[in-house]
């Protein structure tokens, strides 16, 4: 038995992407997120994710901050509960996020 038996390959941040936790649902396809870099941002859920991937408070997501407005971002990926637990175990995200 190997140590990686229960491990799943997860999507990791690329480029400017950062991990974040959804703190509040704002409506109109927008959520308030607390990012790993310590910034609170308003994130937009893109059309390709609407109605396909449901995002709730306390979900761990991957966001890409806007180049021209750092307090806003786009949601790129949502992690399921088991995936978020794995990220915490591996030290990629902390509970203080």
UniProtKB/Swiss-Prot annotation:
Q: Where is the S1-like domain?
A: 6-80
Query: What gene is behind this protein?
Result: eif1a
Which PROSITE patterns does the record associate with it? IF1A (PS01262), S1_IF1_TYPE (PS50832)
Query: What name is this protein filed under?
Result: Translation initiation factor 1A
Q: Which GO terms describe its molecular function?
A: RNA binding; translation initiation factor activity
Q: Which UniProt keywords apply?
A: Initiation factor, Protein biosynthesis
Q: Which domain of life is it from?
A: Archaea
Family, per the entry? Belongs to the eIF-1A family.
State its role.
Seems to be required for maximal rate of protein biosynthesis. Enhances ribosome dissociation into subunits and stabilizes the binding of the initiator Met-tRNA(I) to 40 S ribosomal subunits.
Asked if the Swiss-Prot or TrEMBL record annotates the protein with the keyword Protein biosynthesis, the reply is: yes
- Name a Pfam family for this protein: eIF-1a
């Amino acid at each position: 038995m190997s140590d990686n038996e229960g491990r799943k390959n997860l999507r990791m941040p690329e480029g400017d992407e950062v991990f974040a936790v959804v703190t509040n649902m704002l409506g109109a396809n927008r959520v308030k997120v607390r990012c790993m870099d310590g910034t609170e941002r308003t994130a937009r859920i893109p059309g390709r994710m609407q109605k396909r991937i449901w995002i709730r408070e306390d979900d761990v997501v991957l966001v890409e901050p806007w180049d021209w407005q750092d307090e806003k971002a786009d949601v790129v990926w949502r992690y399921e509960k088991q995936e978020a637990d794995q990220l915490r175990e591996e030290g990629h995200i902390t509970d203080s996020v």
